[in-house]
Design a protein with these regions (language model features):
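Short loop/turn segments at strand-loop or loop-helix junctions that form parts
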Residues: 9-12, 186-188
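Conserved non-cysteine loop/helix-boundary elements of the Radical SAM core domain that shape
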Residues: 10-163
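Auxiliary Fe-S-binding modules of radical SAM enzymes
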Residues: 2, 146, 153-196
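Low-complexity, highly charged intrinsically disordered N-terminal segments
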Residues: 3-7
Length: 196
């Protein structure tokens, strides 16, 4: 028996207005009440979670939230324009768990300023937040992005395939051995990515 969920991925769902979130959630919630689907999954940023938002998510049948944690190293967060402290991530995780919502974390390895050690320490810190599931994404340089500019200027060095595989292996193993189900490794290719 597979679970049937509606998913809002590919953006920061809780970054849109509460009113618009409610409209989307209410629409889907009607299908939950009719037994046609089991729940709602979504992804968002840790700094777009607060009590009011989580209460609304729970009210309308959200069963799983994946946070784009990326890193728990302050230097890496700053270098990637994530201007919030690690405590914000911890608080978002805690709040979701308190409301009984499955917690997913998305980690990126090889970001600007990241090292093997900082990526591994991020995974160790993430374990303290008790995620249920995780995704691990090696950083990709995509055309027409700030990261591509940094790469072309020699300000960022992408991981080699071998480095990315080895780093991912270490983090995957750490998470799985500690009871976190890693549900994806790597980015799902899309037409847009293939063109770039």
């Amino acid at each position: 028996n597979y679970k049937k969920d509606v998913a809002f991925f590919g953006g920061t769902f809780t970054g849109i207005s509460l009113k618009l979130q409610k409209e989307y959630l209410e629409t889907v919630y009607e299908y939950i009440k009719k037994g046609l689907i089991d729940g709602i999954r979504l992804s968002t940023r840790p700094d777009c979670i607060n009590r009011e938002i989580v209460e609304q998510l729970k009210k309308y049948g959200v069963t799983s939230v994946e946070l784009g944690v990326q890193s728990l190293d302050e230097r890496v967060l700053k270098a990637t324009a994530r201007y919030y402290p690690v405590e914000v991530v911890a608080e978002a995780c805690k709040r979701l768990k308190q409301y009984g919502i499955e917690l997913g974390i998305q980690l990126m390895i090889g970001l600007p300023e990241a090292t093997l050690e900082s990526d591994y320490l991020t995974a160790l810190k993430a374990l303290e937040m008790q995620p249920d599931v995780a995704r691990i994404y090696p950083t990709l340089v995509i055309k027409n992005t700030k990261l591509e500019d940094m790469f072309l200027k020699g300000e960022y060095y992408a991981l080699s395939i071998e480095e990315a595989v080895e780093r991912t292996r270490k983090i995957y193993t750490l998470l799985e051995l500690n009871g976190v189900n890693v549900i994806r490794v790597g980015l799902q290719p899309s037409e847009d990515l293939r063109e770039d």
